[in-house]
Each structure stands twice: as structure tokens, then as C-alpha cells.
């Protein structure tokens, strides 16, 4: 199977990491315990699916914040690309650069993909919902962009009530 969903981390402490962020600092996952974290991995800045996904999460930010949540986007694009993407789309959340694909691999968001009959290694669109205790609550892998952000936010609302 080309898509290896990382179920080994489901209901376990989310793997910690530090990555360069568009907020001009390193994002350290361990410093955000106490928040519900929507951590989403996307293939590339300024592509149609990735732009739609980012804008959809951005539109839902008020609801996400109301439910003690934050959104963090991760791809292997560099920070310069992320800054342009963030500015162009007026994104109000941070994007992280994983140029060495270490975090992408850790979360199984890097793997074998197929397109037009060709196989290659790339980013598998994946979203991880991490609860306030730093535990991986839900994983969406090989995400279809349409209505995805809404689905994630519905799950966020459920865990915020518990």
C-alpha cells in the first residue's frame, strides 16, 4: 500500500519536534500542550489544493480558537516560500518548514505516491489532531481537500467538550 497511515502514534503522545516557523522563531510542539493542535502536512505552497486547504482552515480560525485550538501547516517548502504563501492568502496561522523531511517522516506524511502512472516519494496530505494533553486524537491520511477543514473542526468541537 503506498499510503502508510501512522496508526502507531494514534492515542499516544504526539512525537515532539522543533521546526522553523513563519513567526520568525522555531515552533516547538512540546510548548503547546494545553492547546488542541491541528497539525496538517501539505505538498506545496501555491498549488490549487494546498491553497484551498489553507484558506479553508483560515476561514474556520475563529471557531478553532473558540475551541482552544491552533492550526499549524507543514511542508518542505522553505520559509521564504511560506512567507509569500501566507501573505498572498492572508493566512492568520503559522507555516513550518521541514526541508529535511524529518518531521514529515516521523508522522508518516512522507511516502510513495502515484501520479499519472508514475511512482515517486512525496508529501502525503495528512492532518493530525492533537489534544490538550499532547496525545494524537485522530489522523486523516491521503486527505481530499473538499470539506476537510470542516470535518477536522467538527472533531475538534467534540474533543473540546470532553
Placement of each model-derived feature along the sequence:
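Chalcogenol-based redox active-site neighborhoods
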Residues: 6-162
Amino acid at each position: 500500500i503506498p499510503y502508510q497511515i501512522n496508526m502507531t502514534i494514534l492515542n499516544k503522545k504526539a512525537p515532539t519536534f522543533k521546526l522553523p516557523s513563519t513567526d520568525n522563531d522555531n515552533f516547538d510542539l512540546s510548548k503547546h500542550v494545553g492547546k488542541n493542535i491541528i497539525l496538517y502536512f501539505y505538498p506545496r505552497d501555491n498549488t490549487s489544493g494546498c491553497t484551498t486547504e489553507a484558506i479553508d482552515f483560515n476561514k474556520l480560525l475563529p471557531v478553532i480558537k473558540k475551541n482552544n485550538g491552533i492550526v499549524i501547516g507543514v511542508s518542505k517548502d522553505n520559509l521564504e516560500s511560506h512567507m509569500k504563501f501566507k501573505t498572498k492568502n492572508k493566512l492568520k496561522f503559522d507555516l513550518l518548514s521541514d526541508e529535511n523531511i524529518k518531521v514529515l517522516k516521523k508522522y508518516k506524511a512522507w511516502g510513495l505516491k502515484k501520479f499519472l502512472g508514475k511512482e515517486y516519494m512525496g508529501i502525503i496530505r495528512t492532518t493530525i489532531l492533537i489534544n490538550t494533553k499532547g496525545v494524537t486524537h485522530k489522523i486523516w491520511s491521503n486527505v481530499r481537500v473538499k470539506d476537510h477543514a470542516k470535518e477536522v473542526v467538527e472533531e475538534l468541537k467534540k474533543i473540546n467538550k470532553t
